[in-house]
């Protein structure tokens, strides 16, 4: 066990409703890749700050790690705008790039050498993210948090950065916690998911197991058109974006029937057994329904 959360609550000021409330135990193990997912205001960054000891909380966080054994890429990382990137890097890390092979390796890996002579304010969004990632990776911490590491970047830059992160860590035992609202990033990087909604823990577990729990063995997705709604009216539906229809398939036989129906009627479709967006939507819906029922029982 690397870290254990046991009934955690965070409140800001005198607010009545907690910013974060986790009413069960959550365990992080060595080498895990944990994706933290939720809409804006769900409590993702608050959770990271609590785990880092940056905000007060009730409950318990148990770990043998020292504060210096945790590293974090937070959403807002600002440095002295007028200094060169090279000087900032060497000052914070207390090193000389020319004598630090690990730092040289990271600079080369992230193709960052052309940026060293620039002032920080002259860096693009993608370059600033790479700079901060290099600084975080230099700590080589057993537990590292990446909070919205690709926020504000264009698709191509985002994809490249995610692929570089995945490749760098693929053979390493560091535990990663990745906060992101981009589902495809979590499909690529995470093997476990921690789902938050309105400050509450919806669920936590293996990515594949959560998909099976909330979506079935597989799902078949097609456009939400009148023809398709009629064709699929007798099959079990899942919550999905308005422009799509998602059918849950509990067995291979069920899937064959759905697919056969669509092929016979010349309908394009997509099959998935790991769609995080669909899983997240259905997990959240089921959780909120259960919360609503619990609230009604308490009133009665």
Indicate where each model-derived feature is located.
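Conserved ABC ATPase signature
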Residues: 119-123
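Catalytic Walker B motif of ABC-type/P-loop ATPase nucleotide-binding domains
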Residues: 144-147
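Q-loop/switch helix immediately C-terminal to the Walker
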Residues: 76, 81-96
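The feature captures the beta-strand-to-loop junction immediately N-terminal to the Walker
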Residues: 37-39
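C-terminal coupling/interaction segments
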Residues: 250-300
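A short, flexible loop at the N-terminus of ABC-type nucleotide-binding domains that lies
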Residues: 1-5, 9-24
